[in-house]
């Protein structure tokens, strides 16, 4: 009996080793920086009011939906490359540049990913702000690069760029990437100032990327400067003001040689046909985004004033979201009412601007929760 148990034990150990050893062997083959890389911190909800992802609260216009429907039956075929060229031409016209200056991508993230994978290499150093869009750090860690972060300066109800530090640190890096307006503060950073862009472009050893995901809300751009400073790139998206988040449409505005280099790592089929049709149709008729921006701006003021009236520390914004600082769990309070917001760091929260009714609901429900917490 004792002999049989010993055999069973040895067999069990061998069985485990057979499966564990290959797993360890595979891990040893994966680059160390990739094993230790950061992941996108993402929590979603299936139902409720979505004010946690900076989405547009408005559905795409019916004319875009109708255009997409016409192509759904063609899913068995790859789209003709002419469609991608049409998208590039329209994005160029919208951005007041030439088509050869447009790199089309699967969302702005597709552009950022292409930049990290093609214009920097493991061991390079990236410069960005803190706080800023979290995917910069994710892509940096996945690529095995180092990161220098310049802390933004709090200035009453706004946040400001630490310009002197940014320019000094730029001399040490291969890539500078700045979201302007900034996410998650909602504040303008470089304000499209040509002098600052020029200094950054001249100081850095590599490239300067300005992420203009919220360009339509901010109203300023550095895109004209790509002709004066050929190492400057501008990233844009159709996810925000264009209300096309799940269609995953974006583009980069850059020097022709940079665009050619980025295009080598992509195909004419990367953007799915329905998305391409949505993007083309939207860029052919972009006037609707003015209404989106105007309504969001109006609702932002409603939410801002309402939160201020609740004695919350809320920062001003030129985007489609607000930043709040509070040591209570505002996320948990609002989730009890089916409202999702984004919890960030050090008691900071980001709330997307929704419809007027949604903004008023946030104010009402948060007011109830805060009153209850104060009475305990």
UniProtKB/Swiss-Prot annotation:
Source organism superkingdom: Archaea
Stretches assigned to coiled coil: none
Cofactor field: pyridoxal 5'-phosphate
Enzyme class: transferase
Known catalytic reactions: L-histidinol phosphate + 2-oxoglutarate = 3-(imidazol-4-yl)-2-oxopropyl phosphate + L-glutamate
Keywords: Amino-acid biosynthesis, Aminotransferase, Histidine biosynthesis, Pyridoxal phosphate, Transferase
GO molecular function, one term: pyridoxal phosphate binding
Entry keyword annotation includes Cell wall biogenesis/degradation: no
Modification N6-(pyridoxal phosphate)lysine occurs at: 240
CDD domains: AAT_like
Record-listed E.C. numbers: 2.6.1.9
Known pathway: Amino-acid biosynthesis; L-histidine biosynthesis; L-histidine from 5-phospho-alpha-D-ribose 1-diphosphate: step 7/9
Protein's GO biological process: L-histidine biosynthetic process
PANTHER family registered for this protein in UniProt: HISTIDINOL-PHOSPHATE AMINOTRANSFERASE, HISTIDINOL-PHOSPHATE AMINOTRANSFERASE-RELATED
Family, as annotated: Belongs to the class-II pyridoxal-phosphate-dependent aminotransferase family. Histidinol-phosphate aminotransferase subfamily.
Name the UniProt record assigns to this protein: Histidinol-phosphate aminotransferase
Protein species of origin: Saccharolobus solfataricus (strain ATCC 35092 / DSM 1617 / JCM 11322 / P2)
